[in-house]
Amino acid sequence: MVGIIGKKLGMTTVFDETGNAIAVTVVEAGPCTVMQIRDNEKDGYSAIQLGYGAVKEKHLKKPQIGQFKKANLEPKKYLKEFRMDDASSYTVGQELKADIFQAGDFIDVSSLSKGRGFAGVMKRHNYDGGPMSHGSNFRRRAGSIGCNSYPARVWKGKGMPGHMGNTLTTIQNLKVVEIRPDDNLIMIKGAIPGAINSIVKLTSAVKKRNKKKNSMN
């Protein structure tokens, strides 16, 4: 599975050949460095670990510092693994850039969604709420959360107030509209999870085949 780590820069509008406006999200993809290679014999699965973003050594834990020194690589702030059938074609220290994708490819994008803090049921679960008429005290309340004698408990998964957002969210089958390799920019059709400057993980779509198979597949 081809993939790369990037940073969400924001949204803008581009135009296709026929003049149609397309809302796109701009992602700075890479450059990423192959920090570690995992194989089936030693680790039980095949994958590569990519590093993205510079960081000072004083901000790292000792096991991380040891990993970077052993590989003789510059420390990276963000590390993510990408599983694949065979990782033998990659070497530690190899650099991956935005051009691993091409315009027309479909990708899956994963990132932490925006945190909304403590939210009620109307905002968190899209409940209708109660009547807003004169004399009503129900308004934005959740209402009943279960019966009395049976089941005499709250059903698992019942929508209730609580912390909203800041969860790992994946949107599938987003189309790559444009690639700018010189600037390491990928323009993705539509919106993606996370706030501006959020770290995102881009992988080839698992439910759609891209036009051209990449060597990482």
UniProtKB/Swiss-Prot annotation:
The keyword Ribonucleoprotein applies. The keyword Transmembrane helix does not apply. Signal peptide: none annotated. Keywords: Ribonucleoprotein, Ribosomal protein, RNA-binding, rRNA-binding. One of its GO terms (molecular function) is structural constituent of ribosome. InterPro entries: Ribosomal_uL3 (IPR000597), Ribosomal_uL3_bac/org-type (IPR019927), Ribosomal_uL3_CS (IPR019926), Transl_B-barrel_sf (IPR009000). It comes from the Bacteria. One of its GO terms (biological process) is translation. GO terms for cellular component: cytosolic large ribosomal subunit. Pfam families: Ribosomal_L3. Part of the 50S ribosomal subunit. Forms a cluster with proteins L14 and L19. Belongs to the universal ribosomal protein uL3 family. One of the primary rRNA binding proteins, it binds directly near the 3'-end of the 23S rRNA, where it nucleates assembly of the 50S subunit. This is Large ribosomal subunit protein uL3. It comes from Brachyspira hyodysenteriae (strain ATCC 49526 / WA1).
